[in-house]
């Protein structure tokens, strides 16, 4: 009888020891995964801060920030889901009895799921590198409206189409170079043109005045509305030219099947183009400009 009790006690002790080792191993693995989650969240936060700093410096515009935020939100959602699983595991691992009871049914599957997420960490970091590299090279190109449009015009005349193509060619070339650097990734390139107007009015009763009213679908409009509309029409006209230029250069993009291109043309009206310039006037050629931005982001 004593031998049976001794053997039973030894067996119980061995089971307890094995259980403690498994619990300790699970806790250690979970701690490492949670540390990685925190590190990745810090990386995402750092990129967001970098993007906002670039926005304040006029190196990028709000459209680019929105797209970066949307891309980072995908990763944040994945990390939040992983952290929720980690929290569930932490609750179970607090109690040895609960751990032993749920080890095979809950603990191991959750650890396996978290480990798979962790194994893709290097892959996600490489995507963050693309975003950070894009922010490092980000800048705007400025063009005077007079280079493309006649006074009071919003369509590029035939004799200035080649000038527009030459002006925008370096922009497309820079975008192409960056895109090709990361051609192994599925990615989206965004070209943005923002049109601006100064504070001078548009003569009432003229052809342009009535054309803009037709575009606005209004019988009359304030100066600000008219300037907003003409800046929008000019931006869209330049986007059309940019699209044609891209199509001519499309064969220069590597792995083009992994690349999507989107174009955004927006009129900013009488908004001030560059926040760091503090001495803009109402009638000011520095406000009659177009700003061009681009970004390439991993999908």
Annotate the PLM regions.
Residues 2-299:
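N-terminal targeting segments with Sec-dependent signals, encompassing both cleavable signal peptides
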């Amino acid at each position: 009888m004593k031998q049976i009790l001794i053997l039973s006690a030894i067996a119980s002790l061995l089971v307890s020891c094995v259980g403690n080792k498994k619990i300790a191993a699970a806790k250690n693995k979970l701690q490492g995964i949670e540390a990685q989650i925190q590190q990745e969240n810090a990386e995402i936060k750092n990129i967001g801060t970098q993007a906002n700093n670039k926005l304040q410096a006029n190196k990028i515009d709000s459209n680019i920030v929105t797209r970066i935020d949307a891309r980072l939100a995908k990763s944040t959602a994945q990390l939040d889901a992983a952290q929720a699983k980690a929290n569930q595991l932490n609750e179970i691992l607090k109690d040895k009895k609960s751990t032993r009871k749920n080890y095979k049914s809950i603990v191991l599957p959750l650890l396996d799921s978290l480990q798979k997420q962790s194994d893709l960490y290097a892959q996600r970091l490489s995507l963050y590198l693309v975003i950070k590299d894009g922010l490092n090279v980000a800048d705007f190109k400025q063009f005077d409206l007079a280079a493309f449009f006649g006074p009071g015009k919003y369509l590029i005349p035939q004799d200035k189409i080649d000038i527009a193509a030459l002006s925008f060619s370096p922009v497309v070339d820079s975008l192409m170079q960056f895109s090709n650097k990361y051609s192994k990734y599925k990615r989206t390139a965004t070209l943005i043109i923002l049109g601006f107007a100064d504070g001078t009015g548009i003569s009432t009763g003229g052809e342009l005045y009535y054309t803009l009213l037709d575009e606005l679908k209004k019988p009359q409009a304030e100066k600000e509305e008219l300037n907003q509309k003409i800046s929008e029409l000019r931006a869209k006209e330049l986007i059309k030219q940019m699209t044609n230029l891209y199509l001519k250069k499309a064969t220069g993009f590597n792995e083009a099947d992994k690349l999507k291109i989107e174009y955004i043309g927006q009129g900013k009206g009488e908004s001030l183009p560059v926040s760091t310039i503090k001495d803009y006037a109402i009638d000011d050629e520095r406000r009659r400009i177009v700003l061009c931005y681009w970004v390439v982001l991993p999908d």
